[in-house]
């Protein structure tokens, strides 16, 4: 149960459960467009069963709609419509004249396909109810950051700008390939009984993996191998959002943090929730045929840690890498790859100003996702439209409302001036601090705690398993 509590905390950080939402009703009868003001709230049900939520400001609407895409919801869990990350950020938007909206998506789990159409349908409901906005800004967190980037790629005419936060911006194929690499190394070196694809008993599979990794953590050899598993995912050695980043050579603390990422966050996705992905994709969409794990480790941000822990444990790193490279490989179902590429991988064809934000200590959606997205956008010649910001904090989507609002102001300034005027990290932090204590908070383990603004200079390393649609999909 501890892991599910931690996932609930991650959902909280990703803006899933910070505040209550209005009850969901039915689709309103068609009528002439009304004025989006007076704190009007509109909720209802779309044709596929997804629900939507729209809120209007108390005063005059300024003509801009913020369309929010929420993050991953554990399969089978409650899935209400959401129109923002948290009450503080939502309140700032409404107080400043913006309308806000979002949907629940028709399914839980890997819901990208339904999310894209449900979000567009929600915009259509807004248009029919209040008239078409002058500007619609797509934004979202985690899987919702991925959906945000998908919306501006697939429906460019609907949007004026985008703000993907902690987004899965390497795309679905690369993300699940990377997840397979870590799981495969875990299977080969620590728990041969675990299933990494075609999972028949997700709950039992996860339990087996958790028991094995906990046993491994008790020995130097096991800890070295856990670090290798983490390195093939580029999992950072920083876990607690309220703790400072470990020193660059504090490998013991880094490995403990990677163990915490595995047991409290990552393993449920790779050993349990993958089964839901394969169900919607129609098969296994991931492969490691042709992967050279020694070469990938050489490019990993965690290389020095792995070498040091293997040496301390008296283990042969080259022997374990040879075990991985000589093991029987896993092939993908081509139709499932096509499904996941459609839902979604990126071609770099952005046509609106796009600002991404990522914590540097994110072990679920690693910051290297930003490098993958930057690479494909630059390769398509659209790099001038993209800016990327980083927050020096551990955790997945562990942004304060102040940091989110500050990013929104950067994006809004780009929309109004036609050029990027991105302040330095110090100035961004000053702007965030000036919003006051009620904005400078984060949620940690279901508790709200103060947070100092933490924008910082950062350059992520290369994403280890790239896959994109530039210039054409090659499946």
Locate each region found by the language model:
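C-terminal region of N-terminal signal peptides and the immediate post-cleavage residues
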Residues: 8, 18-35
